[in-house]
A protein has these predicted regions:
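Loop-to-transmembrane helix boundary motifs in multi-pass membrane proteins
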Residues: 78-84, 123-126, 135-138, 151-181
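Juxtamembrane/interfacial segments flanking transmembrane helices
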Residues: 16-18, 144-147, 182-183
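Membrane-embedded alpha-helices of multi-pass transport/permease systems
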Residues: 52, 138-149
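Active-site proximal loops enriched in glycine and acidic residues that flank catalytic Cys/His/Asp
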Residues: 60, 132, 146-149, 166, ...
Length: 193
């Protein structure tokens, strides 16, 4: 979180913060269609890990006396705050570099490295940013394979073997997506629909 705040300060100071802020917060309600609402709902479900079994995983580790509504509100609030901070970091840097804001992997892996390369100490901030992205991806993937691990354990398979096996399958899918955009597109479509 501290690194996000440092990157936010850098973005405010060195990015085109006014354009980035306007891009994020000036709504064009003429573009609010049924499809746009469905895309927004899909994004919300994805970022909150709803429908993927992770709710079950995190719920199983909650103390019995925890307030579920309070936990839900805290997660939704913190997720929204982190997303807003990330947007306030990313888009001012994109606009300061004269790049077009995109979305998804194109923004993350194509546009942002160009933005970071044009910055003073961009290699340091870019490395820090992508380390944060890697940590977020790893922590999400751990919770995503837990339902499969629990199911395999019920069939009598050793937890360590189940974890390593599912982790290897996920890793192979990730490696395959590096070498073929068709694999990535198929995985993206399967997980988003």
């Amino acid at each position: 979180f501290v690194l996000l705040l440092v990157l936010l300060g850098y973005s405010i100071r060195n990015g085109n913060f006014e354009l980035g802020f306007d891009f994020l917060f000036n709504a064009d309600f003429s573009k609010l269609t049924g499809d746009a609402i469905l895309i927004a709902m899909g994004h919300a479900f994805f970022t909150l890990s709803l429908g993927m079994g992770t709710v079950m995983v995190y719920g199983s580790y909650m103390p019995k006396n925890s307030s579920i509504p309070r936990a839900v509100l805290a997660v939704a609030f913190l997720d929204t705050i982190i997303a807003l901070i990330a947007g306030l970091i990313i888009f001012p840097l994109v606009f300061a570099s004269g790049l077009e804001p995109g979305s998804g992997p194109g923004l993350l892996f194509e546009t942002l490295p160009i933005a970071f390369s044009g910055m003073w100490n961009g290699s340091i901030f870019g490395t820090a940013f992508f380390i944060l992205v890697s940590i977020a991806a790893l922590s999400s993937s751990i919770s995503l394979i837990e339902p499969g691990i629990a199911w395999l354990e019920k069939t009598g398979i050793n937890r360590l073997f189940a974890t390593c096996g599912l982790g290897l399958i996920c890793w192979l899918g990730g490696v395959a997506s590096i070498y073929s955009s068709a694999v990535f597109d198929t995985l993206d479509y399967a997980t988003a629909n």
